[in-house]
């Protein structure tokens, strides 16, 4: 079974929504890293030397490759990444190998079997 890692950088107010949408589209878990920071096309403005930005979260989803594109697009659409600039970004990368996913793999295999019926 092959996996992809979906990485979502989003405003902290969108974290729960992104997780809920991803789970609804087949993600079996997530990892959230809080207080992430990024910079886009335009540098972040500062006031008296202090950077003024909202908190961002990095959300990681290790998902089965056949579901990855659907999850990626669903999260992006629900969080309006293409509609509201600066809201967040989502992308995926290939995973060479992963260990410690036995329970999730069994769950994914059962779901795939149900879909085939």
Show where each model-derived region lies.
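Positively charged, small/polar-rich N-terminal and surface patches that mediate targeting and assembly
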Residues: 1-117
């Amino acid at each position: 079974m092959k996996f992809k890692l979906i990485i979502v950088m989003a405003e902290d107010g969108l974290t729960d929504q992104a997780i809920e949408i991803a789970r609804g589209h087949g993600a079996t878990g997530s990892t959230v890293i809080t207080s992430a920071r990024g910079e886009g096309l335009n540098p972040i403005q500062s006031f008296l030397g202090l950077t003024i930005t909202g908190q961002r979260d990095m959300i990681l989803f290790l998902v089965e490759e056949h579901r990855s594109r659907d999850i990626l697009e669903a999260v992006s659409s629900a969080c309006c990444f293409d509609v509201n600039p600066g809201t967040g970004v989502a992308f995926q990368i290939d995973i060479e190998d992963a260990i410690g996913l036995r329970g999730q793999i069994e769950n994914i295999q059962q779901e795939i079997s149900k879909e085939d019926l």
